Regions:
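P-loop NTP-binding/switch modules centered on Walker-like glycine-rich loops
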Residues: 3-7, 11-92
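Short catalytic/signature loops enriched in Gly
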Residues: 64-153
Length: 153
């Protein structure tokens, strides 16, 4: 197992591409599992088979990378994907997630994303949601989907 923590952060595009090719090659050559820790969704798209999206130390969504990136279920995953700049939106304002991340030493009683979530309901700030299996096969931690999703895992 290779743990790669932000392997391309701060590198120019050519060096990033070289690192990604090296990781792919070693994955294939050695039948190596890679745990990739990154905020770069382009790197996730290039390398990951499965993805876990975390916020404030908790898993918010987990599933096949293609599924999570093309059909995100959790409001944080959706916001994270929307915050990635695209050339097709040139000249438009960049999307930003409102508010500030929580203080990890003083986490709220409920969902730690609820203060920043555009679709939060009162239950979100009151209790931490369970992780549920969605119809897409992803696991999602969100009260808004609990009634439409099978029982908690």
């Amino acid at each position: 197992i290779l743990i790669a923590d932000e392997p391309t952060t701060g590198l120019d595009v050519l060096v990033q591409a070289t690192i990604l090719l090296l990781l792919k090659r070693e994955h294939t050559r050695r039948n190596l599992s890679i745990i990739l820790i990154t905020h770069d969704l382009g790197v996730v798209r290039a390398l990951a088979t499965r993805v876990i999206v975390m916020y404030a130390g908790k898993i918010q969504e987990e599933g096949l990378a293609d599924t999570v990136l093309s059909n995100p279920q959790h409001p944080y995953t959706k916001a994270l994907i929307n915050a990635v700049p695209h050339s097709r939106h040139s000249g438009q304002r960049l999307y930003q997630i409102k508010g500030q991340p929580p203080d990890l030493l003083k986490l709220p009683a409920g969902c730690s994303f609820s203060d920043r979530c555009q679709v939060a309901v009162s239950m979100c700030s009151a209790s931490i949601p369970d992780l549920h299996l969605s119809p897409s096969g992803s696991k999602v931690r969100c009260h808004l989907f609990s009634s439409d999703i099978t029982s908690p895992l």
